Amino acid sequence: MSFDIAKYPTLALVDSTQELRLLPKESLPKLCDELRRYLLDSVSRSSGHFASGLGTVELTVALHYVYNTPFDQLIWDVGHQAYPHKILTGRRDKIGTIRQKGGLHPFPWRGESEYDVLSVGHSSTSISAGIGIAVAAEKEGKNRRTVCVIGDGAITAGMAFEAMNHAGDIRPDMLVVLNDNEMSISENVGALNNHLAQLLSGKLYSSLREGGKKVFSGVPPIKELLKRTEEHIKGMVVPGTLFEELGFNYIGPVDGHDVLGLITTLKNMRDLKGPQFLHIMTKKGRGYEPAEKDPITFHAVPKFDPSSGCLPKSSGGLPSYSKIFGDWLCETAAKDNKLMAITPAMREGSGMVEFSRKFPDRYFDVAIAEQHAVTFAAGLAIGGYKPIVAIYSTFLQRAYDQVLHDVAIQKLPVLFAIDRAGIVGADGQTHQGAFDLSYLRCIPEMVIMTPSDENECRQMLYTGYHYNDGPSAVRYPRGNAVGVELTPLEKLPIGKGIVKRRGEKLAILNFGTLMPEAAKVAESLNATLVDMRFVKPLDEALILEMAASHEALVTVEENAIMGGAGSGVNEVLMAHRKPVPVLNIGLPDFFIPQGTQEEMRAELGLDAAGMEAKIKAWLA
């Protein structure tokens, strides 16, 4: 869409942060209003992350107004909230391309702009990176400032606290801004806190505090009295004791939608030494009532009509794999009170809403704490329960040592329901589920299953749930199932594949939900088609049978080729000295960028046409 200067006259003056800083302060509330309306107009036309950005408009304007970005370095955690940042940093006219193939990246991305200091997508990384950047800036000696913005969800992760503990030890000059949208501030309390924050962040107070420490350092009773007086004043309205104990100078909470008040507080804090912590209160979805009322639904949106206040409903077609999992979870829990389900802050995405309502005492959302989720599951298993960890492929990476050390070595029966496996689409490199088969396959005695449809997915979940000799995993993709009939649940024989079609010369060994595309190729080439089902243990007998009865083999998977299921097939053949040629089809050796699942599969040759072309070229 073209930018309408008449509709956004103040925003039209800002093509860069340098131009932003030329605006008089009095015009900034109007700029915030236009920026919020432009964000609504843009995202409703193109889709994207929405409610978080609406909540950070004033903060974004204030930070770029006070700090000399990009010389001063601004780091956004996760990046869902960074759309206003992109708009103000030279990407205003391209914001309608965000999350689209070839368009703006969905998160801050170093290769896209000098303003994007840290490429992000996963949570809770900002403070750790910020400390490193602040230490480097100190050694550089050019008075470059460092600011990290982290949300109330992301700050619950252990990594954030590890970083803050380190910052309190080495005391770099940096600012951490906590964007807290979990609660609202009443007018009176908010006004009092805003006034106190400006007082406590001011130079006079800071000078008195530091000077007093020096003057009375040799007089313990007076020093202790001053310390207690300060704590008493701050403790009346400031919930910052934890951050103070970690070594930060805590200021807040303040109204995150008062842009002029934020500017005053940020200017006061800009030149303070040591680690600083500013706690701001915002409302997710601010300025668009439907998003304010339901920020979870409006977190990420398809194209929609803003005047209606409603998102388009799904067509009521096939259920998603997440829903298949959620339905199976409820069905199984109703029969077995030992079932416990765990998610690291992905209740909606993992299809667990109904389960959480029906079985609240057996549902555990551990927040953004993947490591804890896995070891918590280990403890439940030790206690005689049957834990299921529902987690996205890309987030399970964050708990790899816990899978190894706390679950697998102890042979604990923990079932991993791995959602968003393979290509996920618009969220790009940081969210593709490209590596789970590779990083799980090397774990001794791990059972790994890859369903080809929703019925097989249910059977595999059932099989894994009843497997008691160690951990198991079922990986399934983002998106809808294929529409097969659901049959009664029964355990599958571990490590056994099935032949779906008999052909000649060529055998296609398929792992997972690319099966419909592989079936088209098998039909076209008159190839044998095998549903391998298990990545570990592999059906070695079936692989050797296919090698003996065919001239060539092709493996198909939506995982990195390196270390994936196809690599396992190669290992079996080499171990048995079988000289049959094998073509491995899967994800190539680079991070897969954004685009729809269909676009990326076509580009990577993972649709039927692409697979057939690869096979013909290889056989030629």
UniProtKB/Swiss-Prot annotation:
Thiamine diphosphate binds at H80, G121, H122, S123, G153, A154, N181, Y288, E370. Its cofactor is Mg(2+); thiamine diphosphate. Keywords: Isoprene biosynthesis, Magnesium, Metal-binding, Thiamine biosynthesis, Thiamine pyrophosphate, Transferase. The keyword Magnesium applies. It holds the Pfam family DXP_synthase_N. It comes from the Bacteria. Binds 1 Mg(2+) ion per subunit. Binds 1 thiamine pyrophosphate per subunit. It catalyses: D-glyceraldehyde 3-phosphate + pyruvate + H(+) = 1-deoxy-D-xylulose 5-phosphate + CO2. Homodimer. PANTHER family: 1-D-DEOXYXYLULOSE 5-PHOSPHATE SYNTHASE-RELATED, 1-DEOXY-D-XYLULOSE-5-PHOSPHATE SYNTHASE, CHLOROPLASTIC. NCBIfam families: dxs, PRK05444.2-2. Catalyzes the acyloin condensation reaction between C atoms 2 and 3 of pyruvate and glyceraldehyde 3-phosphate to yield 1-deoxy-D-xylulose-5-phosphate (DXP). This is 1-deoxy-D-xylulose-5-phosphate synthase.
